[in-house]
Regions:
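Glycine-rich phosphate-binding loop and adjoining helix at the ATP-binding site
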Residues: 96-195, 322-332
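Short glycine-rich anion-binding loops that position phosphate/pyrophosphate groups of nucleotides
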Residues: 137-140, 202-204, 315-316
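Glycine/GP-enriched mid-protein hinge/lid loop-to-helix segment characteristic of carbohydrate kinases
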Residues: 99, 109-112, 156-157, 161, ...
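Short glycine-aspartate micro-motif
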Residues: 65, 75-79, 129-133, 196-200, ...
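ATP-binding/phosphotransfer module of carbohydrate and carboxylate kinases, centering on a glycine-rich
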Residues: 1-101, 105-128, 246-383
């Protein structure tokens, strides 16, 4: 039993006493208490003052409750998106849903992006962080901090991003492929599923697999590029250089292009599509796109042997009938649907929770374990 497991259990429970944590993990209270004391010292866990709660005095001395630290902003999170870049300072005990503090349009070159970061940095009071956690699209080698290929943001390719970010904030930088961050965040907030395929719709369409509580890893850094599956009959060119990719149909841009073609509107905005689906439901052109999307997702389920799909992103902004159509089509196409139940669930994006989990896994737990082996305590960041 280590810090990681106890902190993970506390994340699931929300708040708990030392005794409750010990019982849930099958530990003796002294053992659990020792781990808790270490986490308190490291600034990962905090104690909650329950003496001010109504009825506390009447019930006698209540047990001291614990939770993941929510007071101290330990990390800086960055979402590098195709159209916008968002930033937030985050504690270890992050909220279940994302709320970003700062935003600026993602520019077309690295130096302009750095200038945008520097401008935001002047507005952030805290200057020392345990790490800078970056959600990034494309094919990302997370271990080496290199963007192998980014169809929609070619300027991010290579290994320049970590050093560019460190020129603004002097802290370790962790790159996390964006759909993997979303899947990990969903698992942190909603634990217990044996596995799921998360599919996110936005400026592109990507996915991530989580099996037995862990993100799937592969020999190659590429994974989850479901949006670059070619669709028969689709002649649109994709930013990856290929023709016919699924995301040219079902990304925001792809859906708006189809709306323009079928409504004779020039350059319709997303709000127009939202309103149109509310008024007309799933029109034939949209039904075809959803059916083609479902075929690709069902094929992925058939390949990996999962029964749960988590849908996040732009499609959920349309009328609920759109989600229901997609869910039914996935169920019809997945082979397990003939024997058992296919679960297709909508969910909010939980990118921040995934980034924090990645930061702890790749920066904090290895450092504390190494220092423990050497006989030194892990030094928390300044308050």
């Amino acid at each position: 039993m280590n810090r990681r497991e106890l902190a993970g259990r506390l994340q699931t429970m929300g708040t708990a006493s030392r005794a409750a944590l010990a019982k849930s993990l099958g530990l003796s209270q002294p053992t659990a208490g020792k781990i808790v004391d270490q986490l308190l010292k490291e600034g990962i866990v905090e104690e909650i003052d329950t003496t001010a709660e109504p009825g506390a005095a009447k019930a006698g001395r209540p047990p001291q409750l614990l939770r993941l630290d929510r007071r101290h902003r330990r990390f800086l999170a960055i979402q590098l998106g195709v159209t916008d870049t968002r930033l937030a300072t985050l504690p270890v005990g992050v909220a279940e849903e994302d709320h970003w503090d700062f935003q600026f349009p993602t520019p077309a070159c690295a130096q302009a992006w750095r200038a945008g970061l520097a401008k935001i940095a002047r507005r952030i009071a805290r200057t020392e962080f345990w790490g800078v956690l970056v959600s990034i699209p494309g094919v990302v080698d997370e271990q080496t901090g290199r963007v192998v290929f980014s169809p929609n943001l070619h300027w991010t390719e290579g290994d320049k991003l970590p050093s560019l970010i460190r020129s603004v904030w002097d802290a370790p930088v962790v790159l996390v492929q964006e759909e993997r961050a979303l899947a990990l965040g969903h698992q942190v907030v909603k634990p217990g599923a044996p596995g799921f395929l998360l599919v996110d719709f936005g400026e592109g369409i990507g996915s991530a697999l989580l099996v037995r509580g862990r993100l799937q890893t592969n020999p190659l850094p590429i994974s989850g590029e479901i949006g670059h599956t070619p669709v028969f009959g689709n002649t649109r060119w994709c930013g990856c250089g290929a023709r016919g990719c699924l995301e040219t149909l079902v990304s925001r841009r792809g859906l708006l292009q189809s709306l323009a073609e079928h409504s004779k509107r020039r350059n319709p905005q997303w709000a127009v599509l939202v309103q149109r689906t509310q008024q007309r439901g799933v029109e034939p052109w949209l039904a075809r796109t959803l059916d083609q999307t479902a075929i690709v997702i069902a094929g992925a389920l058939n390949m990996v042997g999962l029964q749960q799909v988590i849908i996040t992103g732009a499609l959920l902004e349309l009328t609920p009938e759109v989600f229901r159509h997609l869910a039914q089509a996935i169920t019809c196409g997945a082979m397990w649907g003939r024997f058992g139940k296919i679960e297709v669930q909508p969910a909010p994006r939980r990118r921040m929770a995934g980034l924090i989990a990645s930061g702890l896994d790749r920066l904090i737990w290895p450092a504390s374990q190494a220092q423990e082996r050497s006989g030194h305590e892990f030094a928390s960041a300044p308050n």
